[in-house]
UniProtKB/Swiss-Prot annotation:
Annotated binding of Ni(2+) 1, by residue: 2, 5, 7
UniProt entry tagged with the keyword Nucleotide-binding: yes
Lineage, top ranks: Bacteria, Pseudomonadati, Pseudomonadota, Alphaproteobacteria, Hyphomicrobiales
Binding site for Ni(2+) 2: 168-169, 200
Keyword Acetylation: no
Gene that specifies this protein: hypB
InterPro entries: CobW/HypB/UreG_nucleotide-bd (IPR003495), Hyd_mat_HypB (IPR004392), P-loop_NTPase (IPR027417)
Gene3D superfamilies in UniProt: P-loop containing nucleotide triphosphate hydrolases
Name of the protein described by the UniProt record: Hydrogenase maturation factor HypB
Pfam families the record matches: cobW
């Protein structure tokens, strides 16, 4: 996981707003403590031939230890400590973001998926159809280019592009700075489109109300079992490209069953960013969440 491997080096590039700016009066600390790239070289040539007569001879499980991962030269205890330090700092910044969103009565969603699942196409349709009902802003995360933010802006909705460079996910500091560059979204919606990656974004709280995992019918039914942390961390699974399900012989019931093995409480909606099928149900879900996050509703829930 990138909490210890150092893929995020604090050198994200965040666009300046396009004719929009609002001053939140907050200072942000954007560095990641202890993020370094490690290159583990071996001076010896190893020529080992192992004959295993074990039932699991075909499986090398590097996650079968207290740290949940294996890194050359680091003990499980050290991995756990480094991860705690990095995530602890991020969690403090995420709490700051969450407080700001609450003060602005902004409902923030963190959209996560593997590359090519259709997050951006989904967002383009959604913001186009919701922009007359809500103030909307979008934060786009990619390693390079502003292509996705430009697609959002073409709808008339403001978007800030965050290029993470070598980083494989957004973090709370990046989101806080990008939010500063959006127009004021008082009482509106903030969509955060994370970098396409079903691993690292699961660990990083951005201050969002919830994570929405976008999954497409082209990915196969077992993705929730292969990447359980992301599905466990998400409140809603949007199954995109449902218009292709019959062509692909996609088993919807099996996919939902796999997702609920990992997260029994996950909600599931099917839709097609291409045809618009299922978007009415998605908008109803958003409006229900909006109603639940009004100041009166939040006070009653405490």
């Amino acid at each position: 996981m990138c909490t210890v491997c150092g893929c995020s080096d604090g050198k994200a590039s965040i666009e300046h707003a396009h004719d929009h700016h609002h001053d939140h009066g907050h200072d942000h600390d954007h560095g990641h403590d202890g993020h370094h790239h490690h290159h583990h070289g071996h001076d010896q040539d190893h020529h080992h031939h192992h004959d295993h007569a074990h039932g699991d001879a075909g499986l090398l499980d590097c996650g079968a230890n207290p740290a949940g991962q294996k890194i050359a030269g680091m003990s499980s205890d050290r991995i756990i400590q480094v991860e705690r330090d990095i995530l602890g700092k991020n969690d403090r910044l995420a709490a700051d973001n969450r407080a700001r969103f609450r003060a602005d009565e902004v409902l923030a969603f963190n959209l996560v998926s593997s590359p090519g699942a259709g997050k951006t196409s989904l967002l383009v349709r959604a913001v186009s159809e919701l922009k007359d009902s809500f103030a909307i802003g979008v934060i786009e995360g990619d390693q390079q280019t502003s292509n996705d933010a430009e697609r959002i802006r073409a709808t008339g909705v403001p978007a800030i592009q965050v290029n993470t460079g070598k980083g494989c996910h957004l973090d709370a500091a990046m989101v806080g700075e990008a939010y500063d560059r959006l127009p004021w979204l008082n009482g509106g919606l903030l969509f955060i489109e994370n970098v396409g990656n079903l691993v690292c974004p699961a660990a990083f709280d951005l201050g969002e109300a919830c994570k929405i995992v976008v999954f497409s019918t082209t990915e196969g039914e077992d993705k929730p079992l292969k990447y359980p942390d992301m599905f466990a961390a998400s409140s809603l699974m949007l199954i995109n490209k449902i218009d292709l399900a019959s062509v692909l012989d996609f088993d919807l019931a099996r996919t939902i069953e796999y997702a609920r093995r990992v997260n029994p409480k996950i909600e599931v909606l099917t839709l097609s960013a291409r045809t618009g099928e299922g978007f009415a149900a998605f908008y109803a879900w958003i409006r229900k969440r909006m109603a639940a996050t009004t100041p009166a509703a939040m006070t009653a829930a405490e």
